[in-house]
Amino acid sequence: MAAKLILFVCATALVAQSALGIGCGCGCGGRGYGGLGYGGLGYGGLGYGGYGGGCGRGFSGGGLPVATASAAPTGLGIASENRYEGTVGVCGNLPFLGTADVAGEFPTAGIGEILYGCGNGAVGITREGGLGFGAGYGGGYGLGYGGYGGGYGLGYGGYGGCGCGCGY
């Protein structure tokens, strides 16, 4: 009975870690295939200072840009109880979706008109600006190939050929 309980607790912990955890690569102590070896590349991608692929980049502000802004105004109103004679023009842009209403009496000698347009016919976000360029070294030859691994590697097998610790 105790073995079943231990198996259940370990399986629950494994499921929770695989669902909620961040995979930082594999390997022994940051070496081998999950770290600095394998021709200067990390775990299936770019080694990031001894970490495996994807470790520490999503939550440290490096590769996940986030932009926030205040909420758009929910309404825009123009109200007047004055009497205007002549041509009156009101011009502006309403955010995303807007309505226009004219209330009151128009004399038969004048005209009242509302011109309403919505860009190209689609109501929604029409343009999003980029966040600029990310910080990093833009060397023409790159930093990964022949970096720390460089054909000798840091595997546990001494000077293994590819650095993954397997001795090849």
UniProtKB/Swiss-Prot annotation:
Question: Which GO BP terms apply?
Answer: chorion-containing eggshell formation
Query: How far does the signal peptide extend, from start to end residue?
Result: 1-21
**Which protein family is it in?**
Belongs to the chorion protein family.
Region Central domain: list its residue ranges: 60-128
- Stated role: This protein is one of many from the eggshell of the silk moth.
Q: Where is this region: Right arm (Gly-rich tandem repeats)?
A: 129-168
This protein is called Chorion class B protein L11
The question of whether Signal is a record keyword is answered with yes
Region listing for Left arm, in residue ranges: 22-59
**Positions annotated as sequence repeat:** 32-36, 37-41, 42-46, 47-51
